[in-house]
């Protein structure tokens, strides 16, 4: 690993994305619907500055971009497992309700893990914030728009919590392996 250290991203600004010639941008398939505008959950005053810092960081990393869309989904923040850091969570319920579900079935992780039982050494593929490696098509990004203190923003990458994200990302990892 030390020989290839420069190939790893240790900061948000240095991480890349999957090559679009191997992983084309995702189109979100939807049934006919009416656009949605949901009122946002207020940011707690004590977390406001930290939430703004995280949003700016995601803009700089290319995960969020400005939007003029007529959609607005909710978002909120939760504590990560470390009990200190915050994670922004996008409530994609309205999008999931109109999405045509992917036919893929996620793998049985227990079966996969059992194959490594008793092994002296295992391998690990760590895709630093993996969903952020796969881009959404321009035509689908507006469906992910949400309101922030910096105006309307939309996701540029595969949304965590979207109905089809797990099977799509599973296919991506399978292709890589």
Kindly label every feature range from the protein language model.
Residues 149-160:
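Electropositive, glycine- and tryptophan-enriched low-complexity nucleic-acid-binding patches
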Residues 27, 91, 126-128, 161, ...:
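Catalytic palm active-site di-aspartate
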Residues 96-104, 131-143:
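Cytochrome P450 core scaffold surrounding the K-helix E-X-X-R motif
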Residues 13-16, 64-66, 166-177:
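Active-site palm subdomain of RNA-directed nucleic acid polymerases
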Residues 47-51, 105, 124, 165-169, ...:
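Hydrophobic (often cysteine-bearing) scaffold residues that line and stabilize catalytic clefts
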Residues 1-106, 151:
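Reverse-transcribing Pol proteins
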């Amino acid at each position: 690993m030390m020989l290839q250290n420069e190939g790893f991203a240790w900061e948000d600004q240095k991480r890349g994305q999957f090559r679009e010639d191997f992983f084309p941008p995702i189109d979100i398939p939807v049934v006919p619907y009416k656009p949605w505008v949901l009122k946002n959950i207020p940011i707690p005053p004590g977390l406001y500055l930290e939430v703004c810092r995280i949003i700016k960081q995601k803009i700089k990393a290319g995960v969020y971009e400005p939007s003029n869309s007529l959609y607005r989904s909710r978002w909120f923040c939760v504590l990560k497992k470390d009990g200190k850091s915050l994670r922004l969570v996008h409530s994609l319920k309205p999008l999931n309700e109109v999405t045509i579900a992917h036919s893929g079935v996620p793998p049985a992780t227990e079966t996969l893990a059992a194959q490594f039982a008793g092994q002296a050494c295992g391998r690990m593929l760590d895709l630093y914030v993996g969903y952020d490696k796969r881009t959404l098509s321009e035509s689908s990004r507006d469906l992910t728009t949400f309101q922030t203190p910096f105006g309307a923003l939309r996701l540029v990458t595969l949304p965590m919590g979207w109905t089809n994200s797990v099977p799509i990302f599973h296919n991506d990892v399978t292709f890589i392996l």
